[in-house]
Amino acid sequence: MPQCECPEPLSAVQLKRLEEHKYSAAGRSLFEPPCQIYWNWLVQQIPTWVAPNTLTTIGLVINVITTVILVYYSPTATEEVPGWAFFLSALGLFIYQSLDAIDGKQARRTNSSSALGELFDHGCDAVSTVFVAVGTCICCGIGAYPNWMFFCGFVGMFMFFCAHWQTYVSGTLRFGLVDVTEVQIAIIIMYLLTAFTGVSFWEMRVPVLGVNLQTFPILGIIGGFLYSTYNYFFVIMNGGVGKNGSTVADTSVLTPGLHIGLILTLAFIIFKKSSSHLFEHHPCLYVLTFGMVIAKISNKLVVAHMTKSELHLQDTAFIGPGLLFLNQYFNSYIDEHIVLWIAMVLSLVDLVRYCTAVCLQIASHLRIRVFSISPQGHAHKD
């Protein structure tokens, strides 16, 4: 019987360019030098038979599980959460940050660096960004303010996408003085503080200023957004390394903006036009649903950079948000909460399917294993 096989996500030309890819990074964040002492010690404690991708995956799974516990107790990002859950989230994020920082060191230590390792690392970061954003909103009880919940929920994903957008344009991943490490440490401190004081702590008013304590993390997020976005778009708008100032794939530097712009526009329209106040009643599920979509297109952007290929707008990732939009167009014929769950499942399955297919195809092409160290492999700087 003839078998129907799904087309592989990468073409032969893309795989060839992937072999030629060289990792390029610039800049050093504020806390990186002291953290390097800890990371260098930690990687020496890891057995040499443990694959770098295994470390990253373990960290991501722990980070996701601890955040899901927060969502279980606080689905609207307004409820009180047991202190132990925030302790677990702080520990989960610390473990993820630690393992994510040493996966490249483990790859070099075991002579197993590869383009797959770089892609895998960025892919896990894309997913982690979604869950950390939700956890932070729950920590501060920002769900009480839907507009701020929307902003704080999606701004981190937008900045992550922009970081790789400027990489797609310039060919180099740039780190700022205040970057991911600093943000993660700040969130860990917030988790621990909330574990001792409760979510209601952030609702306390500062006597002199007359504002809630929630204002300060929001201001920090706004400041980080303005600082990072300015740096990213300074690189993007000054032209890329391709022909006539184009991207590494010789395409327009503005093309990736269509992807993130479309998904955020859909998310905002559905939020504001919902007759059942979908976002207000289910903010965490809403952010997670659209977060899976953004994680998918962020992964595609990383692949496009590493394979020097065009980023196409047509994508199955938009099916879930499209269903929500169409349902609203037909006056919410189906309960929006049900459609949101359907969109969540579709978006999650689509993300997992794409990432799995890409990893398996690259591993097969490079003759390496995803979660174990191959005797022989193609060495790329990780």
UniProtKB/Swiss-Prot annotation:
Sequence positions that bind Mg(2+) 1: D100, D103, D121
The protein's name: Cholinephosphotransferase 1
Compartments it resides in: Golgi apparatus membrane
InterPro entries linked: CDP-OH_P_trans, CDP-OH_PTrfase_TM_dom, CDP_ALCOHOL_P_TRANSF_CS, CHOPT
Keywords for the protein's UniProt record, in alphabetical order: Golgi apparatus, Lipid biosynthesis, Lipid metabolism, Magnesium, Manganese, Membrane, Metal-binding, Phospholipid biosynthesis, Phospholipid metabolism, Transferase, Transmembrane, Transmembrane helix
Its membrane topology: Multi-pass membrane protein
Catalytic activity field: CDP-choline + a 1,2-diacyl-sn-glycerol = a 1,2-diacyl-sn-glycero-3-phosphocholine + CMP + H(+); 1-octadecanoyl-2-(5Z,8Z,11Z,14Z-eicosatetraenoyl)-sn-glycerol + CDP-choline = 1-octadecanoyl-2-(5Z,8Z,11Z,14Z-eicosatetraenoyl)-sn-glycero-3-phosphocholine + CMP + H(+); 1-hexadecanoyl-2-(9Z-octadecenoyl)-sn-glycerol + CDP-choline = 1-hexadecanoyl-2-(9Z-octadecenoyl)-sn-glycero-3-phosphocholine + CMP + H(+); 1-hexadecanoyl-2-(4Z,7Z,10Z,13Z,16Z,19Z-docosahexaenoyl)-sn-glycerol + CDP-choline = 1-hexadecanoyl-2-(4Z,7Z,10Z,13Z,16Z,19Z-docosahexaenoyl)-sn-glycero-3-phosphocholine + CMP + H(+)
GO cellular component: endoplasmic reticulum membrane; Golgi apparatus; Golgi membrane
Binding site for CDP-choline: N53, R108
Family: Belongs to the CDP-alcohol phosphatidyltransferase class-I family.
Record gene name: chpt1
Chief place of localization: Golgi
Site positions (Increases basicity of active site His): E118
Native organism: Danio rerio (Zebrafish)
Enzyme Commission code(s) on record: 2.7.8.2
Annotated catalytic residues: H122 (proton acceptor)
Enzyme class, UniProt record, top EC level: transferase
Positions on the Lumenal side per record topology: 73-82, 140-149, 197-211, 271-282, 329-335
